[in-house]
Amino acid sequence: VKDIQEAVGGKVHFVNAPDMLEVLWTDRPEIPQTPVITLGPEQVGWPREQKVRWIRKWLTDKGYDAILLTALDEIAWMLNVRGQDVAYNPVVMSYLLVTQDNVLWFARKGEIPDDDGETEDSFHELLADGVNIQEYSDVEAALSNLVDGNYIKALFVDPATLNFSLFSILNSRYVIMGTSPVGLRKSVKNEVEIAGMREAHLEDGVAMERFLHWLQTSVEAGDAV
């Protein structure tokens, strides 16, 4: 948005318009709410409390009050959570706001189904670790209250993943933009993560070999593939 505005000398103004698809797409699926699981240090190396301490130190060193994470893979890494809200991606549709005093995870999409004990257990574990779980749809109101009430005067966001709807409600005076430190940090794998990657590659290799064997034998036998 800023690049476009600067390129045309500020002559283009973006506005938040109603979602016109809602009128046409009457059977539009609801936001997914798949089971949420948590991972322990034996699976990821760093416990979430350690990651929160790390990001808070980063905020202190930079002189910022808070960071808003909008990239789903970064949120999954920060909280050691996994889901299936996006097909073939182990992520949860959510936003994460970390301040020096609070960790707000906007992930709840309504009541947890009675048969989803996994998510309920995961939420209890997160709450015990100081993660305040909010409704997914409450993120805009929460950000507005924090910024308008001067509770946050230096909010760090990554413009590469921040959507326009959230950008439009943030006071630009209080927003610092840059590359997310979480994406950079999670790219440096610890020993546990490296071991997990090796195991995953082995399993993936076995699956690929089985597929190639099936493909070759099927073609040689004249079967339809």
Question: Could you describe each region identified by the protein language model?
Answer:
Residues 1-225:
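Active-site neighborhoods and metal-handling regions in enzymes and metal-associated proteins
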